[in-house]
Amino acid sequence: MTPKEINVIKRDGTKTPLDLDKVHRMVELACEGLAGVSESHVEVNSGLQFFDGIKTSDIQEILIRSANDLISLEAPNYQYVAARLLLFSLRKSVYGEHPDKHPHLRAHVDRCVEKGIYDIGIVNQYTLEEWDKLNSYIDHDRDYLFTYAGIRQVVDKYLVQDRSTGEIYETPQFMYMMVAATLFQDDDKFYRIEYVKKYYDAISKHRLNIPTPIMGGVRTPIRQFASCVLVDVDDTLDSIFSSDMAIGKYVAQRAGIGINAGRIRGINSKIRGGEVQHT
């Protein structure tokens, strides 16, 4: 069977003839400008065997694993090749178009709000002019600062997604901008755009780390602004049971938990006048 006789299944379910040149261009672009890497090594190491009906997403995943397997002390730059290949796949999945074609920030927000992914309150917090300005600040090329381990963690843990279907709704730079825009939405309107830009620059350039609950949930309907929560437990049954309920709710909101049980009486202390001994 020749390449022209092989059809691949695209992400939207349509079939198209296999284009080997397109596969090679993708690998070539992933290796561009990096020392000590080879497109042919990635392709050969993948052991990729094409068959009629193979999914384009599977082709990309095989190439990603191939580049990841080539990472070594002697060839560390394959970590960036694998990262780029993963980014190409991610962008194609999220945008549905060419990986370098990015939607406008406001269009992206409207789409995510409509799907119930982003908090509906964020839409009208900024004017159209402010959304335009925030969109102009986004530098999607900062995605290429990630190593493979870094971008894989972002994809698996922090990007907003439907974990039952695997559908991902945003890319790293949209995530960073929406975190910043959400955190400063209620600040003084004269200064907040500048604050958003500075914060976006700091987190998107990896100069500042964000706690997991905020990075993963602050822009969503969960509205998780707190990272770690301290729960004080008093020396009563009502307080102990209420604390258990609070802990459960905070954990469901992705918050980290700290418990202050210092008020609870010590071991062997009397309960109800000695009817029960505390253990």
In which residue ranges do the predicted regions lie?
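Extended catalytic cores of very large enzyme megasubunits
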Residues: 1-279
